[in-house]
Curated annotation (Swiss-Prot):
One of its GO terms (biological process) is NADP biosynthetic process. Gene3D superfamilies: Probable inorganic polyphosphate/atp-NAD kinase, domain 1, Probable inorganic polyphosphate/atp-NAD kinase, domain 2. This is NADH kinase POS5, mitochondrial. Pfam families: NAD_kinase, NAD_kinase_C.
Length: 414
């Protein structure tokens, strides 16, 4: 892996929204062995519990209610992930008939033609796929399974942007696998461990971003597993950003932009911009400048309780031509920002608000934070292979501290 390559970079995705109601889901199955049903027929999602065992960095995944609804997403338009999805679904239908398989509407139509035979243990029972509008899928998912690379995980998790994310089981079938510890060949063994409450998970934090336009009193809220970054896009002008931390002015920077990353995202855009590599077990928020004009603006690692506010400024209080600043959350473009607009970035679980630094919305207040006794399940719990998946990742995928010695090149005469 090279310095300018961005890990965890999501591929371009196009979301498909169904306008069909739950009583008239009209999809062409294309196969007599497949039956497609509306996801609204399923019960609502059931949350898992996570217990910290002694002498472990991971948390045990415990199902208080039996696992029933599994949402599977894959890297689009690749034969390998399509074949893997059909194989995985067939295994679930044959070995776990009580498990319901949920897919996106376009995926249901795509793969339904690949089921060429009935179930071996029950020839009279067809393969059943549940699908429907995106929000209905979110409301009924117990477990998220991804088949692809890191971009597939980011896409799948983004569906649960402002809700609780289900446990994530990721199989590496893409170009990057920093977040995907399992080879697909292990899918039978791994799923058996998950459904029988014998799997362990690594907890990854999320950032919460509030975008406030200067002419509005409310904000738009999004969540990031990797990073949030402001950048100038295709504008020839550098951005001017006023940065505040916990209500205290930090600096005004003139730069291409700035990236705010989770420890998970420390190996993505932030790393390419010169930021540190941080273990996902470290509670922190990374602030990394992108090509700043001042060489003294170095990357920062802030406490996870920090409340970061960034306001779009202008040079000499004059608005330059085409001074639009781009905002991206996990690689997905958001609304453009102009002079006077602001973003507020905190950890998903909240922050300690100092007087005068409250968020522009009333969803969270200082009293709510202080008086809350019930812990909130936040972040993302990813099924892990070993205690040291992260160390394996930076060694095998990043080539951490690799030698620059050239290997002998073979010739035709060798």
């Amino acid at each position: 892996m090279f310095v300018r390559v961005k890990l965890n970079k999501p591929v371009k995705w196009y979301r498909f929204y169904s306008t069909l109601d739950s009583h008239s889901l009209k999809l062409q199955s294309g196969s007599k062995f497949v039956k497609i049903k509306p996801v609204n027929n399923l019960r609502s999602s059931s949350s898992a519990d996570f217990v910290s065992p002694p002498n472990s960095k991971l948390q045990s995944l415990i199902w208080q209610n039996p696992l029933q609804n599994v949402y599977i997403t894959k890297k689009p338009w690749t034969p390998s992930t399509r074949e893997a999805m059909v194989e995985f679904i067939t295994h679930l239908h044959e070995s776990y008939p009580e498990v319901n398989v949920i897919v996106q509407p376009d995926v249901a139509e795509e793969i339904s033609q690949d089921f060429k035979s009935p179930l071996e243990n029950d020839p009279n029972r067809p393969h059943i796929l549940y699908t429907g509008p995106e929000q209905d899928i979110v409301n009924r998912t117990d477990l998220l399974v991804t088949l692809g690379g890191d971009g597939t995980i980011l896409h799948g998790v983004s569906m649960f942007g402002n809700t609780q994310v289900p446990p994530v089981l990721a199989f590496a079938l893409g170009t990057l696998g920093f977040l995907s510890p399992f080879d697909f060949k292990e899918h039978k063994k791994v799923f058996q461990e998950v459904i029988s409450s014998r799997a362990k998970c690594l907890h990854r934090t999320r950032l919460e971003c509030h975008l406030k336009k200067k002419d509005s009193n409310s904000s738009i809220v999004t969540h990031a597993m990797n990073d949030i970054f402001l950048h100038r896009g295709n504008s020839p002008h550098l951005t001017n950003l006023d940065i505040f931390i916990d209500g205290e002015f930090l600096t005004r920077t003139t730069a291409d932009g700035v990236a705010l990353a989770t420890p998970t995202g420390s190996t993505a855009y932030s790393l390419s911009a010169g930021g540190s590599i941080v273990s996902p077990l470290v509670p922190a928020i990374l602030m990394t400048p992108i090509c700043p004009r001042s060489l003294s603006f170095r990357p920062l690692i802030l406490p996870h309780s920090s409340h970061i506010r960034i306001k779009i400024g202008s040079k000499l209080n004059q608005k330059p031509v085409n001074s639009v600043v781009k905002l991206s959350v996990d690689g997905i473009p958001q609304q453009d920002l102009d002079v006077g607009d602001e973003i507020y970035v905190i950890n998903e679980v909240g922050t300690i608000y100092i007087d005068g630094t409250q968020l522009p919305t009333t969803r969270k207040t200082e009293n709510d934070f202080n008086n809350s006794k019930k812990p909130k399940r936040s972040g993302i719990y990813c099924v892990a292979k070993t205690e040291n998946d992260w160390i394996r990742g930076i060694n095998e995928l990043l080539g951490f501290n690799s030698s620059f010695r050239l290997t002998k090149r073979q010739t035709d005469n060798d």
